[in-house]
């Protein structure tokens, strides 16, 4: 069996930043530290932080007065921010800068009296936070997930309409929805730069190339991770057997026992230790040597972080108008 490792894979800069904020808060203030929603969607990461004293909550009312509160990487609505401000809390914001960019796009549209359409998955915390940035009572904020949703949608003013996207969507699916939006609402305006983050796009490109070589693709990521689910779906659409796994213990021998080539990748919130454990598990099932498949242009983590920060700074300047 040959094992191909997608590159890039695993942690993105926004996830690493969010985890570091929680770790630093624990180191400085000590336990307990309260985190609104799972800081990132990965069971291993969340369990590790919980063991160190992080308490994950969904409602601000669960946080006692005088406590430390951290917003997750997915961002929160303006209503949640206002509620936290009204309490005697010390608040730190771990929202991914690229999610904040989308928040600012929505807030700008709201100020200008434009209506906004968000492409995203209902119920996802990032979507809830982004929808909650719109506050103009005379306008409207709408959520669509598919081209069918677009054709059924009615807005108040088609002349002043813009769209944004959740940052962790499938590039292919989003393209189809955007095409439908432009046909349904010819005057709709999109973001100056694609809202789907570079880490999501790069990892999807890597899986696309990986799936051309591998018979089976294993995606390391939790079930509630949007970007991890999109990676598994992409490989499946390419006709490959693909499985989303939390860790190596999820691997079933029958998945890979006949495979000559197995591809492995990880979602943006999955640490590399989990990938290492998956490789070890595969090697225990067969004589296997892992190869690093350069399925996408390799970008060093430091460059990813600089890119993330650069995009954020440029976005602030462009959206401040």
UniProtKB/Swiss-Prot annotation:
<dbReference type="GO" id="GO:0019288">
    <property type="term" value="P:isopentenyl diphosphate biosynthetic process, methylerythritol 4-phosphate pathway"/>
</dbReference>
<comment type="similarity">
    <text>Belongs to the IspH family.</text>
</comment>
<feature type="binding site">
    <location>
        <position position="167"/>
    </location>
    <ligand>
        <name>(2E)-4-hydroxy-3-methylbut-2-enyl diphosphate</name>
    </ligand>
</feature>
<keyword id="KW-0414">Isoprene biosynthesis</keyword>
<feature type="binding site">
    <location>
        <position position="124"/>
    </location>
    <ligand>
        <name>dimethylallyl diphosphate</name>
    </ligand>
</feature>
<dbReference type="GO" id="GO:0051539">
    <property type="term" value="F:4 iron, 4 sulfur cluster binding"/>
</dbReference>
<keyword id="KW-0560">Oxidoreductase</keyword>
<keyword id="KW-0479">Metal-binding</keyword>
<feature type="binding site">
    <location>
        <position position="41"/>
    </location>
    <ligand>
        <name>dimethylallyl diphosphate</name>
    </ligand>
</feature>
<comment type="function">
    <text>Catalyzes the conversion of 1-hydroxy-2-methyl-2-(E)-butenyl 4-diphosphate (HMBPP) into a mixture of isopentenyl diphosphate (IPP) and dimethylallyl diphosphate (DMAPP). Acts in the terminal step of the DOXP/MEP pathway for isoprenoid precursor biosynthesis.</text>
</comment>
<dbReference type="GO" id="GO:0016114">
    <property type="term" value="P:terpenoid biosynthetic process"/>
</dbReference>
<comment type="pathway">
    <text>Isoprenoid biosynthesis; isopentenyl diphosphate biosynthesis via DXP pathway; isopentenyl diphosphate from 1-deoxy-D-xylulose 5-phosphate: step 6/6.</text>
</comment>
<feature type="binding site">
    <location>
        <position position="74"/>
    </location>
    <ligand>
        <name>isopentenyl diphosphate</name>
    </ligand>
</feature>
<feature type="binding site">
    <location>
        <position position="124"/>
    </location>
    <ligand>
        <name>isopentenyl diphosphate</name>
    </ligand>
</feature>
<feature type="binding site">
    <location>
        <position position="225"/>
    </location>
    <ligand>
        <name>(2E)-4-hydroxy-3-methylbut-2-enyl diphosphate</name>
    </ligand>
</feature>
<feature type="binding site">
    <location>
        <position position="74"/>
    </location>
    <ligand>
        <name>(2E)-4-hydroxy-3-methylbut-2-enyl diphosphate</name>
    </ligand>
</feature>
<feature type="binding site">
    <location>
        <position position="226"/>
    </location>
    <ligand>
        <name>isopentenyl diphosphate</name>
    </ligand>
</feature>
<comment type="subunit">
    <text>Homodimer.</text>
</comment>
<dbReference type="InterPro" id="IPR003451">
    <property type="entry name" value="LytB/IspH"/>
</dbReference>
<keyword id="KW-0411">Iron-sulfur</keyword>
<feature type="binding site">
    <location>
        <position position="41"/>
    </location>
    <ligand>
        <name>isopentenyl diphosphate</name>
    </ligand>
</feature>
<feature type="binding site">
    <location>
        <position position="226"/>
    </location>
    <ligand>
        <name>(2E)-4-hydroxy-3-methylbut-2-enyl diphosphate</name>
    </ligand>
</feature>
<feature type="binding site">
    <location>
        <position position="269"/>
    </location>
    <ligand>
        <name>(2E)-4-hydroxy-3-methylbut-2-enyl diphosphate</name>
    </ligand>
</feature>
<feature type="binding site">
    <location>
        <position position="74"/>
    </location>
    <ligand>
        <name>dimethylallyl diphosphate</name>
    </ligand>
</feature>
<keyword id="KW-0004">4Fe-4S</keyword>
<feature type="binding site">
    <location>
        <position position="227"/>
    </location>
    <ligand>
        <name>dimethylallyl diphosphate</name>
    </ligand>
</feature>
<feature type="active site" description="Proton donor">
    <location>
        <position position="126"/>
    </location>
</feature>
<feature type="binding site">
    <location>
        <position position="225"/>
    </location>
    <ligand>
        <name>dimethylallyl diphosphate</name>
    </ligand>
</feature>
<dbReference type="GO" id="GO:0050992">
    <property type="term" value="P:dimethylallyl diphosphate biosynthetic process"/>
</dbReference>
<comment type="pathway">
    <text>Isoprenoid biosynthesis; dimethylallyl diphosphate biosynthesis; dimethylallyl diphosphate from (2E)-4-hydroxy-3-methylbutenyl diphosphate: step 1/1.</text>
</comment>
<feature type="binding site">
    <location>
        <position position="12"/>
    </location>
    <ligand>
        <name>[4Fe-4S] cluster</name>
    </ligand>
</feature>
<feature type="binding site">
    <location>
        <position position="197"/>
    </location>
    <ligand>
        <name>[4Fe-4S] cluster</name>
    </ligand>
</feature>
<feature type="binding site">
    <location>
        <position position="96"/>
    </location>
    <ligand>
        <name>[4Fe-4S] cluster</name>
    </ligand>
</feature>
<feature type="binding site">
    <location>
        <position position="124"/>
    </location>
    <ligand>
        <name>(2E)-4-hydroxy-3-methylbut-2-enyl diphosphate</name>
    </ligand>
</feature>
<dbReference type="GO" id="GO:0046872">
    <property type="term" value="F:metal ion binding"/>
</dbReference>
<feature type="binding site">
    <location>
        <position position="269"/>
    </location>
    <ligand>
        <name>isopentenyl diphosphate</name>
    </ligand>
</feature>
<feature type="binding site">
    <location>
        <position position="226"/>
    </location>
    <ligand>
        <name>dimethylallyl diphosphate</name>
    </ligand>
</feature>
<dbReference type="GO" id="GO:0051745">
    <property type="term" value="F:4-hydroxy-3-methylbut-2-enyl diphosphate reductase activity"/>
</dbReference>
<feature type="binding site">
    <location>
        <position position="41"/>
    </location>
    <ligand>
        <name>(2E)-4-hydroxy-3-methylbut-2-enyl diphosphate</name>
    </ligand>
</feature>
<protein>
    <recommendedName>
        <fullName>4-hydroxy-3-methylbut-2-enyl diphosphate reductase</fullName>
        <ecNumber>1.17.7.4</ecNumber>
    </recommendedName>
</protein>
<dbReference type="Pfam" id="PF02401">
    <property type="entry name" value="LYTB"/>
</dbReference>
<feature type="binding site">
    <location>
        <position position="227"/>
    </location>
    <ligand>
        <name>isopentenyl diphosphate</name>
    </ligand>
</feature>
């Amino acid at each position: 069996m040959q094992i191909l490792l997608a590159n890039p894979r695993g942690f993105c800069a926004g996830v690493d930043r969010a985890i570091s904020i929680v770790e630093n808060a624990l180191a400085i203030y000590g336990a307990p530290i309260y985190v609104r929603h799972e800081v990132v969607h990965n069971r291993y990461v969340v369990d590790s932080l919980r063991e160190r004293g992080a308490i994950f909550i969904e409602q601000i009312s669960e946080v006692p007065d005088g406590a430390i509160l951290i917003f997750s990487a997915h961002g929160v609505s303006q209503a949640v921010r206002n509620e936290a401000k009204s309490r005697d809390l010390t608040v730190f914001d771990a929202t991914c800068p690229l999610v904040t960019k989308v928040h600012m796009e929505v807030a700008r549209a709201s100020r200008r009296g434009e209506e906004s359409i968000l492409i995203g998955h209902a119920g996802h915390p990032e979507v809830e936070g982004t929808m909650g940035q719109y506050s103009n009572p005379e306008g409207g904020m709408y959520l669509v997930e598919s081209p069918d949703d677009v054709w059924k949608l009615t807005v108040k003013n088609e002349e002043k309409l813009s769209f944004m996207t959740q940052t962790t969507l499938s590039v292919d699916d989003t393209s189809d929805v955007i095409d439908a939006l432009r046909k349904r609402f010819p005057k709709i305006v999109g973001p100056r730069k694609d809202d789907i983050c570079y880490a999501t796009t790069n990892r999807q490109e890597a899986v696309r190339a990986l799936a051309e070589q591998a018979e089976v693709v294993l995606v390391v990521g939790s079930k509630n991770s949007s970007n991890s689910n999109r990676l598994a779906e992409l490989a499946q659409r390419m006709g490959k057997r693909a499985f989303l796994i939390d860790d190596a213990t999820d691997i079933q021998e029958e998945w890979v026992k006949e495979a000559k080539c197995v591809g492995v990748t990880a979602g943006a919130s999955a640490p590399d230790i989990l990938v290492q454990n998956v490789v070890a598990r595969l090697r225990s099932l067969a004589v296997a040597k892992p190869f690093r498949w350069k399925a996408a242009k390799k970008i060093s983590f430091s460059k990813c972080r600089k890119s993330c920060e650069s995009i954020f700074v440029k976005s602030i300047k462009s959206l401040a108008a």
